[in-house]
Curated annotation (Swiss-Prot):
Coiled coil: none annotated. The modification Phosphothreonine is found at residue 200. It comes from Blochmanniella floridana. Acts as a chaperone. This is Chaperone protein DnaK. Induction: By stress conditions e.g. heat shock. Keywords: ATP-binding, Chaperone, Nucleotide-binding, Phosphoprotein, Stress response. The lineage of its organism: Bacteria, Pseudomonadati, Pseudomonadota, Gammaproteobacteria, Enterobacterales. The gene is dnaK. Residues 605-643 are annotated as: Disordered. Residues 606-625 have a biased composition (Basic and acidic residues). InterPro entries: ATPase_NBD, Chaperone_DnaK, Heat_shock_70_CS, HSP70_C_sf, HSP70_peptide-bd_sf, Hsp_70_fam.
Length: 643
């Protein structure tokens, strides 16, 4: 059985880990980094860049450089949060045929799971390079407060990337696994995992029970906000910088995509610097220009100013903390340890607010960037049998139910119910002689059905005519370990049954997923061919350089015909290198190697002559030394220490 990799598919950064020799190990990517920016770029020549290479070129290619895509995954275009992003993102967010939020890249419609799949492919390749074998299975993390549609879309992304997603695991739960795996304390411990990442916020209250070496991780309650994170902190700082520049120069940078991309990079850097410094300078020469000439941005930002800008965002995280504790029937004093996860928790203001809320300092022995991937790898180890004596009991973050008469949501499974779980309830018809019922599946905490998230609907027909209230329709909700819902409806009288795995009325259908998988495979083949083309071009370039050097050094030692043949072959190779045909370049490389044989011989002969000359000089020097026979006494004297 191959390794099951653990992937933290983050909004800002992603990370991959494995279990090796019973210990989790975070893997370095091809750039040598342990985390990879969750950035994907589509270049003008059709190449897809992922991670740091994509981030580096974002300033010159803002419209085709995609970041924070996790905020769009599994969402509808008309969602309030998506509409907010439509206004501020440099890339184009559009509505798909079924109302999902998709991307328009150079006129091509692309689904968010396809973008996430590119990041997952990079994680997969990182693991394969380290292990030296194919990787086909993964545990992928999601925010605890992700709904069914977002979880399903994440699984779709894994599938498009060529991975069988063995388990979807909540990020705070994964962090708890990473924290609790090597802790030897016996008995029960209650931990709070505060996870503030690039785009999402979660709080989970988790009980770790250690009895005779067997550890149980039970999630007692979870809460959060799937559209609150570091990107929002960046946006507020960017807004401030734009307004200050407008006051100073009278120019609105919002109309300049290149300037905004530079500003975004600088704002992110400044925010990070202000976690360790009291002030920083935002210095962007030639940020824009008008009729009077180029304009430069040079603004000083203090930590106090940044904190005043983002304090409301930090305060927004406190209500979910209260709700989670209330749902778990616990007080603040019951919490033994507080763990901070996500890069944004490095901000001193965040740490201060969390510390004040829980009346204790958060632990510092958990790496906020790597803990989630490590926990995912641990869960992968549990599933493959590499990790023993660990039991994970996760929960569903939101209530699940159906719409009943009067537009009311009737819950079948309450939020914070341990999963996997199954629940049935009997309903009846609303009208006389009703021959079919529509099961409208909902997720959320509101009483009015329309105020909750619609996960989809299906019909159960063929119900025998009867007075209203007589037919018995048994509706069963079954949530699997990934938190994905399966629903069935059964007419108890006729035995007629209808079952579905809930796919949001949005989401990708099977045909779309298969097409995207095929495209991903085709891209992989295209990437391989591109890599081979680069390799042969590099080989050709090296051969051109070395042949020209030899021609300069020993060209006078070969015949004029041979010299002309080599020069002609050099020109032909140089010309063919401009094309995309690998076979043509290979052919001309071989041709140049063949015709430059005489040149190689001449070069080799010159080297031999040089070696022989050196030996001759050495022998001459030696014979002169032997002939003299004189020995020179060393003029040393002994110096005795004075006493």
């Amino acid at each position: 059985m191959g390794k099951i990799i653990g992937v933290d598919l983050g909004t800002t950064n992603s990370c991959v880990a494995i279990i090796e020799s019973n210990k989790p190990r975070v893997l370095e990517n091809s750039e040598g980094d342990r985390t990879t920016p969750s950035v994907v770029a589509y270049t003008q020549d059709g190449e897809i860049l992922v991670g740091q290479p994509a981030k580096r070129q974002s300033v010159t290619n803002p419209k085709n450089t995609l970041f924070a895509i996790k905020r769009l995954i599994g969402r509808r275009f008309q969602d309030q949060e998506v509409q907010r992003d439509v206004k501020i993102m440099p890339y184009k967010i559009i509505s798909s045929n079924n109302g999902d939020a998709w991307l328009d890249i150079k006129g091509q419609k692309i689904a968010p799971p396809q973008i996430s799949a590119e990041i997952l492919k990079k994680m997969k390749k990182t693991a394969e390079d380290y292990l030296g074998e194919n990787v086909t299975e993964a545990v992928i993390t999601v925010p605890a407060y992700f709904n069914d549609a977002q979880r399903q879309a994440t699984k779709d992304a894994g599938r498009i990337a060529g991975l069988e997603v063995k388990r979807i695991i909540n990020e705070p739960t994964a962090a708890a696994l990473a924290y609790g795996l090597d802790k030897e304390a016996h008995g029960n411990r209650i931990i709070a995992v505060y996870d503030l990442g690039g785009g999402t916020f979660d709080i989970s209250i988790i009980e770790i029970d250690n009895v005779d070496g067997e550890k149980t991780f039970e999630v007692l309650a979870t809460n959060g906000d799937t559209h609150l994170g570091g990107e929002d902190f960046d946006s507020l700082l960017i807004n401030y910088l734009v307004e200050e520049f407008k006051k100073d120069q009278g120019i609105d940078l919002y109309n300049d995509p290149l300037a905004m991309q530079r500003l975004k990079e600088s704002a992110e850097k400044s925010k990070i610097e202000l976690s360790t410094s009291q002030q920083t300078d935002v210095n962007l020469p030639y940020i824009t220009a008008d009729s009077t000439g180029p304009k430069h941005m040079n603004l000083r930002v203090t930590r106090a100013k940044l904190e005043s800008l983002v304090e409301d965002l930090v305060n927004r995280t406190l209500d979910p903390l209260k709700t989670a504790l209330k749902d778990a029937n616990l007080s603040v004093s019951s919490v033994n340890d507080v763990i901070l996860v996500g890069g944004q928790t490095r901000m001193p203001l965040v740490q201060k607010k969390v510390s004040e809320f829980f009346n204790k300092e958060p632990r510092k022995d958990v790496n906020p960037d790597e803990a989630v991937a490590i926990g995912a790898a641990v869960q992968g180890g549990v599933l493959s049998g590499d990790v023993k004596d660990v039991l994970l009991l996760d929960v569903t973050p939101l209530s699940l139910g159906i719409e009943t008469m009067g537009g009311v949501m009737t819950s079948l499974i309450a939020k914070n119910t341990t999963i996997p779980t199954k629940h049935s309830q009997v309903f009846s018809t609303a009208e006389d002689n009703q021959s079919a019922v529509t099961i409208h599946v909902l997720q959320g905490e509101r009483k009015r059905a329309s105020d909750n998230k619609s996960l989809g609907q299906f019909n159960l027909d063929g119900i025998a005519p009867a007075m209203r209230g007589i037919p018995q329709i048994e509706v069963t909700f079954d949530i699997d370990a990934d938190g994905i819902l399966h629903v069935s409806a059964k007419d108890k009288n006729s035995g007629r049954e209808q079952k579905i795995t809930i796919k949001a009325s949005s989401g990708l259908n099977e045909e779309e997923i298969k097409k995207m998988v095929q495209e991903a495979e085709a891209n992989a083949e295209s990437d391989r061919k591109f890599e081979e083309l680069v390799q042969i071009r590099n080989q050709a370039d090296h051969l051109l350089h070395s042949t020209r050097k030899q021609l300069k050094e020993v060209g006078d030692r070969i015949s004029l015909d041979d010299k002309n043949s080599i020069e002609q072959s050099l020109k032909e190779l140089e010309l063919v290198m401009k094309n995309e045909n690998k076979g043509d370049i290979e052919s001309k490389v071989q041709e140049l190697i063949k015709v430059s044989g005489k040149l190689l011989e001449a070069s080799s002969q010159k080297y031999k002559e040089k070696v022989n000359d050196s030996k001759s000089d050495l022998n001459k020097d030696k014979s002169e030394t032997d002939a003299s026979g004189d020995v020179v006494d060393a003029e040393f004297e002994e110096i005795k220490n004075k006493k």
